[in-house]
Structure formats: C-alpha cells, structure tokens
C-alpha cells in the first residue's frame, strides 16, 4: 500500500511587503542581496512585526478549503542549521504545545470523488534562495546565497496522507492552485511561487520526504520514481531509510540529501518577539463576504450557463486564465462547444507540450474569435489553424495577418482539387480501389491530398470530390 501526503508552500505574492519587515515582496530584476534589511538577515536586535495582510490572505484560503480557523495566531521558532536561514531558525507555526496554527482541518475533493483531508495551514517566512552556479546540488563546485527572498510570506498547507497514487497528488495540487489563483493570493506562474514537499511510504515502511518540487507535473514524476525505488528496495530485502531526498528534474531521479529530522529536532518554542495575534469572528465574517466565485461553483455555473460538459468545465477552471479566456471569448462567439474543443484539444494541448500555462500566452479573446470565424467561413482548415497557433500564442499575431503573410487560405477551387485527387489516385491505385468499400480509406486519400496542397485543401470538399470521382454514393 502506498501513502502520500503533501506539504505545499505558497508564496503570498499579493502582499506588497515581506512577512515581518517593510522590504518589498517584489524583488524582480534586483541584484542579489539588495532587497534586504536587518530583519531579513537575522541581525541581532532586529525585531519582526507581523504583516496583517498575510493573516487575512491565510483566512481566505482557510475558508476556501473548509477549514476551522483559530481564534489567535501564535508564531514559533523552528530551529535548524542550514545556510539559507541566517538566524538558524525559521519563524513558523507548529501543531503542538506552545503554538496555534492559523487553521486546522478542511478538505478538497478530487474529480473521482476522493476526499483529501487537510491537516493545517501555517504562516511562515521563506528562507533565502540557494544557487548552484556550476551544476546541481550534487555537482556544483560552490554554492551562492541570495537573501532577496528571505522573509517572504508563505503559507504551508499540510495534507493528511490520504493519496495513494501520484496522479492524485498532481490533481490535488492543480485544484489547490486554481483556488489560490481565483482568490488572488498567489500568482502561481512566478518562479517558486508554489512548491511542494511530497512524503511517501510504501507497504507501511519508513516515510521519505522529497523536497522542494516545482510543479504538479514534477510532483507526479518524482512520486512515480520514488515509489518504484522503494518497491525495488523492499523486493530485494533492503531497508528504506527515513530520509529527505532531492528531486533531480534533469535526470528524473530522487537523490538523498540528509537524514529526515523528527519534530523534536526542531526545538520549537514560541517566538518572544511576536505576541499572539487575535482573530475575531467579525474579522472572519468580513473576509468571508469578500470571497470571489471559487472553482467548484464556477464549474457548475459554466455547465449551466454555456451547456458544456462537466469534464470540459473542470478542465477550463483548473486554470483560471484558461477559464477567463473562455468566458471573454464566449461574449463574442456563441458556438460554445466549438470554442471549448479548440481551447482544450488544440490550444491547451499545445501549451502543455511546450510546458507553458495559459497565462503565459499572448493570445486573447480577439485572436480566438477571429480564428474560429475563419474556420467557420472555410477560409482556413483546422490543420492550418493548428499550424499557425504557435505564432498566435508566442507572438500575439492576428490569425488573418499570418494567413495573408504565408498564403495559407483554404483551397476550394474544384478544378484544381480534382487534378490533385487524380494524381493521388494514380499514385495510390490500391487505396483508391479499397476506398469504394471502406470509408476509412477515403480519409487516407484526403490526407494525401492535404499533404500535396500544404494542408490547404478544404477537407470536406476534397472528401466529396473523391467520392464523386470514384463513384461512391
């Protein structure tokens, strides 16, 4: 039996400043170690002050995942010795004596009905960024530290070990990401904005933690590898150590980094510089009123409002930018099913293949409306639409402009198409004969015509002309 639990670290990118000081939270483009102050660097005598907006963001997330919110917030010091934490402790929270996490409980439901319970949400500070300039953690000759990130506000969302397959962990993270984006508390496209530690054990063995994985897809890959590694060790009669491992995304393997600490090793105790922060019911209700439409409700609305399937609505809403693009385009194009098919089967598939997200695309609703109308009017074929998609997405070019530049208008000249079809029939006499009794072979001949015309032949007209020439009724 496999047990999987997750610890998800979410940057509160909606904050203007860091968690305990006034340093800006946006350090994009700044030189290393310039977005810092005595508090970020843990210098003696520097006193932290809690950013109240971080508390409000955490309450929003807790409400969205059906959690029980505490009536006060108590921060603790989590002690460990590692170069990314200058003061040798992290200001965090702990589910134990002397601390109160901002929320406990809660859950998310996966597509097939499985419930993943959430143990708690903690507010904590982010450590510095460790850089390996000449390779990976294992191969780099030296290490650099950038404290620009140190002290950024984080939420740590800890699940129970309710998942049994890597694909469930990926789905959980994708759904959580959608919630965070709908709430507006995290821009998950930013590097490192959402990272996960995956804990996994096989057949009741020791728990292994895979640290700092950058995306839902990589979490799935890392877990697949780690489960296979543990099963192989068990089959050979070898022990599985309780340890922390690193996911090497280039080699697609996990590698050991250190023995896994126990809770006692961290020597938690309340931070004397940060008094308890009260959370009133009035504050919770005030924040509840500001919650936007969340993914589950949006899925139901899309099904009702646009008549699309529950599956299609779910795929759209799992990425807020994709759902937003659908709804904006639907204001100007009423064939919703055709729009969904283009978005999911062509647009999203291409983005996934290139490891891009919809929010990184330069295609807007105006691009999609024009592309769909060109298809409806028979000006281009679906093959041409797929061919020009990269230029639309990466450069933001209008479809009509690309078609004009590259001469990609669909060919509807019957005389021209008949000549091409006759060429194909002469080259493929056996296929032409089989086509008289097998409709599937007609599609093969259509494909040959498309190839000869650079994908520009109108497929429906070509199909009709082939049947006419071969005497197929």
From Swiss-Prot:
Q: Which domain of life is it from?
A: Archaea
A Pfam family recorded for this sequence:
GatB_N
Under SMART domains, the record lists: GatB_Yqey (SM00845)
Q: Which UniProt keywords apply?
A: ATP-binding, Ligase, Nucleotide-binding, Protein biosynthesis
Q: Which GO terms describe its molecular function?
A: asparaginyl-tRNA synthase (glutamine-hydrolyzing) activity; ATP binding; glutaminyl-tRNA synthase (glutamine-hydrolyzing) activity
Can you state which reaction this protein catalyses? L-glutamyl-tRNA(Gln) + L-glutamine + ATP + H2O = L-glutaminyl-tRNA(Gln) + L-glutamate + ADP + phosphate + H(+); L-aspartyl-tRNA(Asn) + L-glutamine + ATP + H2O = L-asparaginyl-tRNA(Asn) + L-glutamate + ADP + phosphate + 2 H(+)
**Which parts pass through the membrane?**
none
GO process annotations (BP): glutaminyl-tRNAGln biosynthesis via transamidation; translation
SUPFAM superfamilies hit by this protein: GatB/YqeY motif (SSF89095), Glutamine synthetase/guanido kinase (SSF55931)
What Enzyme Commission number(s) apply to this enzyme? 6.3.5.-
Q: Tell me the subunit arrangement.
A: Heterotrimer of A, B and C subunits.
The UniProt entry, under NCBIfam families, shows: gatB (TIGR00133), PRK05477.1-2 (NF004012), PRK05477.1-4 (NF004014)
According to its UniProt entry, the function of this protein is described as: Allows the formation of correctly charged Asn-tRNA(Asn) or Gln-tRNA(Gln) through the transamidation of misacylated Asp-tRNA(Asn) or Glu-tRNA(Gln) in organisms which lack either or both of asparaginyl-tRNA or glutaminyl-tRNA synthetases. The reaction takes place in the presence of glutamine and ATP through an activated phospho-Asp-tRNA(Asn) or phospho-Glu-tRNA(Gln).
Q: Which HAMAP family match?
A: GatB
What family name appears in the similarity comment?
Answer: Belongs to the GatB/GatE family. GatB subfamily.
The name this protein carries in UniProt is Aspartyl/glutamyl-tRNA(Asn/Gln) amidotransferase subunit B
């Amino acid at each position: 039996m496999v047990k999987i639990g997750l610890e998800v670290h979410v940057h509160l990118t909606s904050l203007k400043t860091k968690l305990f000081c006034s340093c800006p939270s946006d350090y994009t483009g700044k030189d290393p170690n310039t977005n810092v102050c005595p508090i970020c660097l843990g210098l003696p005598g520097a006193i932290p002050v809690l950013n109240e907006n971080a508390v409000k963001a955490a309450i929003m997330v807790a409400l969205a995942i059906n959690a029980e919110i505490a009536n006060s917030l108590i921060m603790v010091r989590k002690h460990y010795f590692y170069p990314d934490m200058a003061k040798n402790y992290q200001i965090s929270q702990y589910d134990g004596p002397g601390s109160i996490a901002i929320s406990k409980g809660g859950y998310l439901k996966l597509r097939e009905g499985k419930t993943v319970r959430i143990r708690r949400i903690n507010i904590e500070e982010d450590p510095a960024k460790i850089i390996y300039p000449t390779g990976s953690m294992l191969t780099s000759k030296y290490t650099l530290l950038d404290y620009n990130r140190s002290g950024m506000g984080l939420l740590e969302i800890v699940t129970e070990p309710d998942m049994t397959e890597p694909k469930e962990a990926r789905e959980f993270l994708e759904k959580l990401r959608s919630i965070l984006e709908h709430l507006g508390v995290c821009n998950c496209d930013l590097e490192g904005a959402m990272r996960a530690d995956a804990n996994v054990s096989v057949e009741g063995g020791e728990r292994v933690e895979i640290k700092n994985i950058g995306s839902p897809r990589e979490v799935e890959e890392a877990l697949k590898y780690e489960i296979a590694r543990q099963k192989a060790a068990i089959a050979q009669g070898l022990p599985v150590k309780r340890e922390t491992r690193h996911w090497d995304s280039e080699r697609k393997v996990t590698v050991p980094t250190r023995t896994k600490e126990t809770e006692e090793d961290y020597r938690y105790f309340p931070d004397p510089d940060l008094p308890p922060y009260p959370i009133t019911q009035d504050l919770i209700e005030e924040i509840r009123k500001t919650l936007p439409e969340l993914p589950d409700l949006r899925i139901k609305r899309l099904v009702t409002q646009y008549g699309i399937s529950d599956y299609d609505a779910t795929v759209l809403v799992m990425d807020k930018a994709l759902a937003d693009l659908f709804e904006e385009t639907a204001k100007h194009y009423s064939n919703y099913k055709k729009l969904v098919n283009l978005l999911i089967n062509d647009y999203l598939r291409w983005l996934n293949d290139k490891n891009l997200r919809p929010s990184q695309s330069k295609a807007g609703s105006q691009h999609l409306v024009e592309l769909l109308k060109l298809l409806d009017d028979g000006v281009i074929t679906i093959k041409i639409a797929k061919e020009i998609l990269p230029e639309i997405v990466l450069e933001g070019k209008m479809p009509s402009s690309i078609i004009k530049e590259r001469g990609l208008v669909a060919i509807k000249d019957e005389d021209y198409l008949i000549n091409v079809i006759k060429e194909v029939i002469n080259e493929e006499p056996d296929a032409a004969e089989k086509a008289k009794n097998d409709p599937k072979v007609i599609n093969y001949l259509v494909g040959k015509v498309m190839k000869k015309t650079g994908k520009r032949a109108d497929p429906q007209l070509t199909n009709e002309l082939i049947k006419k020439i071969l005497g197929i009724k």
